Amino acid sequence: MPVFAVAGSGTREQVQDLRLDVHMQLVDTPRAATILLVAGAIPEELAEALARLHDSIPHPRCTVWWPLGAPSGAWLGSFPHHVAIEDQVPGRLTAIQRELLSGQRPSEPPILPDVDAAPWRGVGPFGQGGTGMTGGTPYGRPMAELGPDRDGLRLDVLPLTVGPFFPRFPAGLVLDAKLAGDILVEVAVRDNPFVTNSVRGNDRAGRGPFLRALTEPVSLAELELARARAHLRWVADALAACELAALGLRVLRLATAIMPGDSEPVESLARVLGWTQALGWSTRGVGRIEAAALEGLGAGPVARASGLPDDLRAQDQAYRDLGFEPIVQAEGDAAARWRQRLAEATQSLELAGRAGDRRTIPTGSIESPRGLLEPAGGPAARLLPLIPGLLEGMEWGDAVTTLVSLDLDLEEASAAAGQAHGEAVAS
Amino acid sequence: MILLGPVGVALAVFVAAILLALLIRVSGDVQRHPALAVPERSPFAGGEAPVVHAWNRYHARYYVMALVFLAFDMEMVFMYPWAVVFVREGGIAMVEMGMFITILLLGVLYAWRERVFEWA
């Protein structure tokens, strides 16, 4: 059934795993959906955008909330109608869709008022004609302002806000862009909505090993397996963003099934992707970041793809005993970041196979799959300020490729803070 | 058919066409769906509302490429009569066509320098 899924705090992987079920069809636009699935807690800042998303789903529609450990009432403020489900998500969603289509379950009314922000009616008897078409405000909406083009012409600069639920971007990322044709001429990134008080202090039991490693010893084998899986999950998402969704699904299946020491499938995947010229053309030379710009940001694979041997694991005695050395690439473009993550996935599986019962010593910071994670913030928070400078002047397609290759997780920082907070409360 | 005669057939077709048009019109009215609410109509770009109209005057860059293509298309047209007389005229025709293509090629190089072939 067609589902538009919104991944709230800490639910990215569970939502991604829904793709593995043959009955689930995660669609990219609410127009194609019947069910709006909201997982976890959504910060209040995104409530209005979520309501707009809900209202743009055609009838019959239904909202389903999958709490996944989020406290009840974390999100329900503006949603008078919804169904909460705990488990057996695909089965329950199928049943709900059947009820909707057979008329047993009424379609949900809109949340936002049916009021046009820019009402307009022409002079003719059918509302046609008048100054609206040619007077600079077609159908009551102002047209984009003019800006200089590279040919010396003055053409429209279209303001466009993308996100927070744009399916190719991490949940919560909002870009205020200005487009001249296909080119981004101005980009601003809004504040991370997850770093607010409205989602902090959630019940974060059962979070991943990297968050636990901030405060307690965790086995190296578990950490490295989780790292390899996280990289493969990124590859799965990035392939879907390249419109190679079927291959992405296979990689996702691999990510959930791979075991320590079993690096051969990942190596062959890296070979196949290396041969794939369609991927090479869309990533080579795209989104190049100089090493100097990433110095001290703890940007993990992104920094290492630009040639910075920046890895907390290199300072850990347990990793040094295993002969760990950071892998680095030189180019620093999106293609290098693809290669970097695949190489690191292979390396992590090998490390996990040899790690035995070694454990980390909690130091308050950890090298997560996305970079240096500490309670004060994750790598996404440090990479966000780079984005406007990186994307300006790019074509829209390249901008999406670049953003996907950065693997931002806006929610990770608040999760790390929540983990530290939870520990402090517990002790 | 024979009973009706040619005028009768034309009349029958005329009446049938009018009835069909009315039928289509009435069935459209019967099936009419309620108008979409404003949030249902607004374009989706991730959950935020658009602020300006989507009518957007942007640079159709392919038109310069189209002009360059046209120039080479005409060159091919010149080549047909040239190919007919080429054997008779020999080397001199070869040199003339070489000059013609070189001049066109200089034009392409100029267009390249002016970033005509950049799509965006």
Map each language-model feature to its residues:
Chain A
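Iron-sulfur-associated redox domains of electron-transfer enzymes in respiratory
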Residues: 1-118, 345
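Metal/cofactor-centered catalytic core regions of large enzymes
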Residues: 86-93, 97-427
